[in-house]
Amino acid sequence: MNLFFCNRTIEKGEIRRFIAWFIFHHGTARTTQMVERLKVLGFRHATKAGVSLSVDDLKIPPSKRWLLEDAEEEIQFTERQYQKGKITAVERFQKVIDTWHSTSETLKDEVVQHFLQTDTLNPVYMMAFSGARGNISQVRQLVGMRGLMSDPQGQIIDLPIRSNFREGLTVTEYVISCYGARKGLVDTALRTADSGYLTRRLVDVAQHVIIRETDCGTLSGISLMPMKDQDKIIFSLEERLIGRVLAESIYSIQEKKYVARRNQDISANLATQIVRVKKNNIFVRSPLTCKANRSVCQLCYGWSLAHGSLVDLGEAVGIIAAQSIGEPGTQLTMRTFHTGGVFTGNVAKQIRSPIDGIVHFPTILQNQMTTTRTRHGEEALLTNIDVEILIQTNAEKSVQLKLPQYTVLFIKDGQFVRSKQLIAEVSSKNKKLQSVEIASKYVTSDLYGEVYFDNLVLQERKGGYGNRMNRVGQHGGLLWVLSGRIYELGIELPIMFQAGDLVLFGCILAEQDIATTFGGILKIDFFEKDSFARENIDSKRIHLTDSISSYNKKPINATTRAAENSSLNDKNVDIKIFNSLFTLQDVKVYHFDSFRIKEDFIKEKVKDYYLLKSLNPAISKKKRFENTSEKKKTHIDSTLKRETNDQGVSYNGHAAVATTNEIKDYLFSNSCNPWNLELSSDLKVKRDQVIGKLVTEAYLTSTGGIVKYSGILVERYDPIKKGYKVLKGGILLWIPEETHKVKRSTVRLFIEDGDYIPKGTKLLPNVVSKHAGLVNISQTNDLYDEITIKPGEIYTPKDGKQALEKHQCFVQVGEEIVDGLIAKELVYLEVINKPVITNRFVDKKNDVVRETQEDFIKGSENKEVVLLIRPVVQYLVPDNRDVPIPPGIHNIRNNINLKAIQFIRYQDGETVSSFEPVELVQVSLAIDLKESGQKTAAIELIPIQDNDMVTTSSKHINKSKKPYDKNLSVKEKNRNRVTQILSLDKGKLFEFQIGLFESLFIRSNEYIESNSQKNICRLLAKNGQYVVPEDSIAIKEVIGKYSGEVRQSEKASEEERSFLIMNESDHITLSLKDSSKNLKLGDLLHKEDFIAPGVRLPQSGQIIQLQSDQVTIRIARPYLVSSEAVLHVNHGDLVKSGDTLVMLIFEQAKTGDIVQGLPRIEELLEARRTKGLKPLPNNLHDRLESLFFQCRKKYGNHRAARKSLEEIQLFLVNEIQSVYKSQGVSISDKHIEVIVRQMTSKVVIEEGGDTTLLPGELIELHRIENINKNVSIHAQYKPVVLGITKASLNTESFISAASFQETTRVLTKAAIEGKTDWLKGLKENVIIGRLIPAGTGFNEHERISSNMSNIYNDLGYVINPIYEKEKNKVEEADFEDIIFEDNRTPKGFRLKDEAS
């Protein structure tokens, strides 16, 4: 081999090419040795050089400072233009973004140039540009500037990071850079999952694509061209050709010979020769046009890229394709800047003047230009044709510049330009059609004031951004906000001024009397905001009850009086006027801190008292205060005893104290009438709301039993009251029986089914019976048994039939039971069919019957009919109106009554399984309000006048919030457990009071803004005072905090009540010596406008006063509104700083560039129709339909389907390829083609014709073409593009589809259709556990097939030649497995004798 010298710089790309060349010429073994030597050489030189990175190696280019200064200056100019209303918020934003992006890119180039000019051996430069470590982007951040970052929503933050890591970041820059860093981490985490799922879907759709044959014989193919992005080639033709097979022969005219033949595979050398002969449209074979059924042939696929030779038969190319596309998914990074799409990632191509000179336009251009507005809000000219312009320095020197169509010119004819000055920009209109998306930007007000429209024409219409879209005129207009202070007053407040009035600081702007409607006794609370959290709560908030009963009213302390006499501007005020009261006398109070304690207390200590478990769970269990530590379960102390006397019931005992996060519940009992009332503090009650229950044992049973109604009428079941409301009284019949539920196989039973046991018999190890009776053991479910003891007498009747007729019947007193037995009381008869073992007999002394039975059963089994005579308990249920209720005292107005409501807990015939007492009827006490109106009933606890009614002893005495709390219990301090003894002496009375009241709650910040005005509420009445209807109780006043002129909003209505006061800070006065400008009152002037020689406006505004020597201007702020913008305000509206004024609508380009990361790839592969509930413009389905419609006119239905599918296939391949290429990811075209083939292989039937197909059915294109050949009336169909998910679910193998998604649906559908799975793919065979038909398994499959043919030959069968011919005719190769039956000849075979 001759040595030769190659004079090139060895960098990453060059090494790659060199190694590829070496492999091709010298093979793998020698290449391995060469690469090893290359590595050693590299390490040796790196060691000698001692390349390391130090801080001094990070050299910042000196040009950075003036580049940033230029950018700052440009942005300040843009900001001034925006403040003047010359450009919109969108244009300002885009200008700022573009300026900083351009600066950052320029600085990047400066960094590279600086290294080249100063130190080419700089370690940073060598590492980054050799490709060893790092890249230019990271170098830029180290020594240039970090640039723009995006926020979590993907919008660019228009504040760039000017510093680099060498200089160090400021705090603000660091926080902004954290946005991007965090976004990067989150994106990486999410993208990994997305990429994995994408790979799974791709594998599923293509797993059955295997190389099954050598040549499908197709003459079709696709044309390959270099892939370009604008003028830049991103995928060269040579690269695209390597590994392909030619579909046509290539002839060189110059050399007069064929360079390559059809069906020849293309190597790298051959690719170079072909491109030299033919630059474009090289016709190659492709998986897209392969005729092999459900597979790809060797020649259409081409090389296996791993080996550089034709792919082997049995290669699972579908899996390889899926992995090749899915794996780089994680590399599709989101850009560090710009995911919101203000610009397209690349700065538009700019044209700058090469020399100083004067610009000359050709004459033809004068009529071929239109005025346009650039995206930065600048006026410019747009060329409609390709043109050349001339820049001339002098007569001798000139330069001609070629400008393509749709170039934006920033210069005019005859204008002088400097060298490097920007003169034009190539517009994106000349690029291929890009999909655009609609974006919006909200503009908010910078100051308080009034909205003013200037040349803004509105038009209402419905649109995508809501039902009302306000559209401005064609050229937009200005929206001004005129400065002023805003007062927002409550609707009910009468104002004390008019528009044009001058108001001073501290004057009353509005006031309102607060009057009572009904009159009554006053009760006032006032407290500071967040007073619940304060420790000194009782000094700030006073709770006083009305003086309606004779009790000691507490003296109002100094704080209260001071608060009443002064303004309550920092306090909330709660005023209640009671106008109806109903008082229950002689009520005793017991306090508990949990429902469980109360239940135990009632059950164990006070058998004749019954507690309502929950008056209203939503009210009684809610938490009113801050959360504290979880309260432990406590139990009533055993020293709580019951003592009875003539006057009532008194209790001495310990009770646990509630923590601050619990609502207290009070148990009220009346000493004369056995009523027990339970409610939460401050409870509001409604009409018919139950507040108490009758305490009685009258309806309490000893155990469970059967319920029967006699003459009782009830309503339907009430789930809230948990019972049936009694409409008409009657008698409730109760047949007692004792029921125990036991877990089977875990507990030993001491009794058997059919036993008759005495009272006190041991049933279980720790359970004895309460009654004597017949034992019945039944099975409720697989786990539990039920033991039922039915009290009663056993009797064996002489006539079994007569007894059976009396089964489950009542027998009244004096009536015959059976065999002459007469009932002494009401009994219930039940026939027992099972054997009864008993020594019990009917005795003559028995209360149930009068006569005795002479012969009795004793210790013997009776297999005949046995009668069980069961006792019945009768309960009288009166009508509701006849139930006695506790007496009460009516006060003031007699508007409240109490009424009783009865609820039966169980329905007629219901069996209650229990061994504990059961309450059958609940008698409740309810409120009966005679008047409804805007009034609420409330319950109050009033202590009767007496000395110390309640004595307490406790560890901590804490401040209380309610007077009766202090009398009843001690609040806990600092969350300590406090136990206190509560003692109610006999004869000490409390009144239980229900009242109707008006509630007036006044918040200190209820109707005004505290920074502009002050709210004062003055009380005109005192606590406990009786007021008549329409009396004033308090007065609200609004005090102004600013002086100035009142300018009422033009749109101020009764609903708004907003006013504007213009004070001194809202206007400026300028002196005018000589006003050359014609100024008028009301003129709107822009910032920096000249209003007189040498006098510039410091701020934009409106002239409100004009004199000969001075002008007063009201400060204002203009906002330019573009067309199609949605306005959120109207002319004359009052707005605050930060309020939204307008939503600007604009279009932004969506390039092939992967600005959204993986979603763009997914959008293409899933063939999405919509994005974010909006139709996706120019989507694949619309594009295919349009192509099919055009082709159908030209070629007819059948050819049009194939033609339009081919077009969409090429579009898809190129789109997906360009997306990956934009990220520097190289994927061979053939992998994408394999996947796209699966997406575009089916059509949807429109009309079935003579076929058996139904409209809407999906079928493969080649199958319907074959079917149509054999019918007279063809089926009509149209092409369809399926996303990879849908294609996976519509595959022929139901096992593969079911293992992917929607398992139940797929299997159900397959079962209904009676589908057969021929196990052709890899996935199905893996699931079944067979050898897969690919790789070595493919050859095994072929071997089995040939062996089968030999066996048939040996058996005397030969292949039928007619069948062989028919088989060859069919284009669709049939790969289905043939399952042979033993008793018949397989299809296509016949006996040798027959063949002869």
Swiss-Prot record:
Cofactor(s), by name: Zn(2+)
Binding annotation for Zn(2+): 216, 290, 297, 300
Catalytic reactions on record: RNA(n) + a ribonucleoside 5'-triphosphate = RNA(n+1) + diphosphate
Cofactor note: Binds 1 Zn(2+) ion per subunit.
InterPro entries given in the database record: DNA-dir_RpoC2_beta_pp (IPR012756), DNA-dir_RpoC_beta_prime (IPR045867), RNA_pol_Rpb1_3_sf (IPR042102), RNA_pol_Rpb1_4 (IPR007083), RNA_pol_Rpb1_5 (IPR007081), Rpb1_funnel_sf (IPR038120)
GO biological process annotation, one example: DNA-templated transcription
EC number from the UniProt entry: 2.7.7.6
Family, similarity comment: Belongs to the RNA polymerase beta' chain family. RpoC2 subfamily.
Protein known as: DNA-directed RNA polymerase subunit beta''
Originating species: Chlorokybus atmophyticus
